């Protein structure tokens, strides 16, 4: 069996894949790090990747920049190819927009909610 490849999308020149990247490496995955903000292209198909992670960063999914729109649209490729996807902060906003959701400030004007523990619910559950 070949080594798994995780596509990691980050938004700053010196961004790290952090604990997620570390855990994926510990489990034998190779990381393919891309930065669309610096005009790095994302694959049209996920044939050579086993999963995708889009990280956070300074922008909002509501920003009207070409690379933000490109990433939001690109998520459809991951979903179409039925690959696991993890959106962290901005990445979660992008997934919500891709699926037709709305991104807005909270009523208390807080910027983020902080850490939240995710628990696997099993394979094959569709959104």
Predicted segments, located by residue:
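Cysteine-nucleophile active-site neighborhood
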Residues: 54-125
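N-terminal beta1-alpha1 cap of cysteine-dependent amidohydrolase-like domains
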Residues: 1-66, 70-83
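Helical cap/lid subdomains and adjacent loops of hydrolase enzymes that gate the active-site channel
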Residues: 15, 22, 113, 125-126
């Amino acid at each position: 069996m070949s080594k798994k490849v995780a596509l990691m999308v980050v938004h700053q020149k010196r961004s790290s894949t952090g604990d997620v990247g570390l855990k994926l490496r510990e489990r034998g995955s190779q990381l393919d790090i891309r930065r669309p903000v610096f005009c790095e292209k994302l694959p049209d198909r996920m044939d050579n990747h086993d999963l995708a992670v889009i990280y956070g960063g300074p922008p909002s999914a509501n920003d009207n920049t070409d690379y933000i729109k490109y990433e939001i649209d690109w998520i459809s490729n991951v979903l179409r190819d039925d690959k696991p996807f993890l959106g962290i902060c901005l990445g979660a906003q992008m997934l919500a927009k891709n699926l037709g959701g709305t991104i807005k400030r909270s009523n208390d004007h807080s910027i983020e909610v902080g850490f939240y523990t995710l628990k696997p619910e099993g394979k094959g559950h569709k959104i």
